[in-house]
Amino acid sequence: MEQEGQEKKKEGRLTLVLALRTLIAAFGSSFQYAYNVSVCNSPSELMTEFYNDTYYDRTGELIDEFPLTLLWSVTVSMFPSGGFAGSLLVGPLVNKFGRKGALLFNNIFSIVPAILMGCSKVARSFELIIISRLLVGICAGVSSNVVPMYLGELAPKNLRGALGVESQLFITLGILVAQIFGLRSIRQQKGWPILLGLTGGPAAAACPPFFPESPRYLLIGQEPRCRQKALQSLRGWDSVDRELEEIRREDEAARAAGLVSVRALCAMRGLAWQLISVVPLMWQQLSGVNAIYYYDQIYLSPLDTDTQYYTAATGAVNVLMTVCTVFVVESWARLLLLLGFSPLAPTCCVLTAALALQDTVSWMPYISIVCIIVYVIGHAIGPAIRSLYTEIFLQSGRPPTWWGQVHWLSNFTVGLVFPLIQWAGLYSFIIFGVACLSTTVYTFLIVPETKGKSFIEIIRRFIRMNKVEVSPDREELKDFPPDVSE
C-alpha cells in the first residue's frame, strides 16, 4: 500500500526531462506559428512598397490602389489557407510518422519558406513571399494540431492541463516578439526580409530526433519495449506499469473504434457530445480577438504617443496572463478557465462606447486601452481549450483533428467576414460581444469538466452522456462500426 502511494506521488512530479522536452517542442512549433501571425503587421507598408517597386521595375508602371490592396490581402490570407491545408495533413502524418515524426517532417514547411522570404527582396520577387506564406501556413496548421496532442500524451494526467498550456504560452510569446521586432525604433527599412526569415530558427528546434515518441502512439504501433523506455525516460523512474496499464486500456477502447476520419466522426452517435463540446473552439475565433490585435493601432490613433508601444504592451499582458494560467490550470477547474469569456461581452459594450466618444472626450482612448487589456486577459485565460480536444477523444479520434479544421475554418471565416461587418463601424464589437456571451452560456451548459481525470475516465463519462452500450471489462464502444476509416 505504501509503495502504491509513493508511485502515485511520483506520477505527479514534473521531471526535468519532461519539462525540457515539452518546452522545446512547444517553442519550436507554437512560437513560430504565432510569430507568423503577427510578423507582417508592422512592416506591411514597407512590404507593399516593395510590391509596388518590384512591379514598376518589371513593367514601368505602378500598381493601382485596389489591386495593391487585393495583392496584400492575398498575401495575408495565404497563411490561414495554408493552415487549413495543414490541418488536413495531420491525420496521415501522425498515423504514418507518429507525433514526433510529424513534427520533424513539418520542419520542411517552415525552414524552406523562411529561406525564400529572406531572399525575396534580393530576388526582387514578391511572389516568393506569397508562396512562402502558404507554406508556412501549412506548417502552422500541422504544428497547432500535433503539438497539443504530443504534449497531452507525454504528460501525466495531473500535469496534462499545465503542460498543454505551454503551447499557448509560446503562441503569446511569438506574438509579443513579432510586435517588439516591429517597433519603429528597431525595425529598419532594409531589415524586414530578415524579420520574415527568422521563422525558420524555432522550427529547427521543434523536435530533435532524440526526443521520445508519445508512449500512447507507440502502443498503436505495437512496440512494448519502446513505449516502456520512452515512458521511463519521461517519468524518471522504472516503475511505470500502472500508467502503461492505463494506456493499454485506452488502446483497447481505441481499437474497438478503429481509425476514424472527420466525416466518420461527425456521423457517429458515440461521439456526439465530444463534437458538441468542441464548439467553443470555433466561438473563440469568432469573438473578435484577431480584430483587437490587427486594428488596435486604428482604435488608439487619437493618442499622442506611438500606438505600437501599446500594441506591444497588450502582447506582454497576454504572455503574463498565460504564464499565470500555467500555474492555476491544475488547481482550478477547466470550466472556470473556459469561462474567461464571461467578462468580454460587457467589455465589448464599454469599448464600443469609448471608441464612439474618443474624438470628443480626451480621456476616452485610455478607457479603450483598459478595455483592450481586459479583452486580452479574457482570451489569455482560455488556453485550457487547447488541451480539451486531446482529453475528450480516444487515440482513433485525435488524428482527424476536428479541432484543427474548426480552428482554421473559423480563422479564415473571420478574415473574410470582418471586412464585411465593418459597415457597422465602431458597433462591430457588439457583434463580437454577442459571440462572447454565447460562448459563455454554451460552455457553462454543455462542456463537461475534465480536470484530474484519465483519458479512460473522461471517455467513460462521454459514453454515459452519449448513451452508448459499454462492455465494462473491455471498454468497447458498441455504437462504433468495426472499421470506419477511409
Curated annotation (Swiss-Prot):
Residues listed as glycosylation sites in the UniProt record: N52
Entry GO CC: apical plasma membrane; plasma membrane; sarcolemma
Catalytic activity as recorded in UniProt: D-fructose(out) = D-fructose(in)
Family annotation (Pfam families): Sugar_tr (PF00083)
Annotated positions of the N-acetylmethionine modification: M1
Major location (coarse): membrane
Tissues expressing the protein: Detected in jejunum. Detected at the intestinal brush-border membrane (at protein level). Detected in duodenum, jejunum and kidney.
Residue intervals annotated with topology Cytoplasmic: 1-19, 93-99, 151-162, 212-274, 328-334, 386-402, 448-486
Residues in the Extracellular compartment per record: 41-69, 121-127, 184-192, 295-306, 356-363, 422-426
Keywords linked to the UniProt accession: Acetylation, Cell membrane, Glycoprotein, Membrane, Sugar transport, Transmembrane, Transmembrane helix, Transport
Function per UniProt: Functions as a fructose transporter that has only low activity with other monosaccharides. Can mediate the uptake of deoxyglucose, but with low efficiency. Essential for fructose uptake in the small intestine. Plays a role in the regulation of salt uptake and blood pressure in response to dietary fructose. Required for the development of high blood pressure in response to high dietary fructose intake.
Protein name as catalogued: Solute carrier family 2, facilitated glucose transporter member 5
Species in which this protein is naturally found: Oryctolagus cuniculus (Rabbit)
Taxonomic lineage of the native organism: Eukaryota, Metazoa, Chordata, Craniata, Vertebrata
Gene this chain is encoded by: SLC2A5
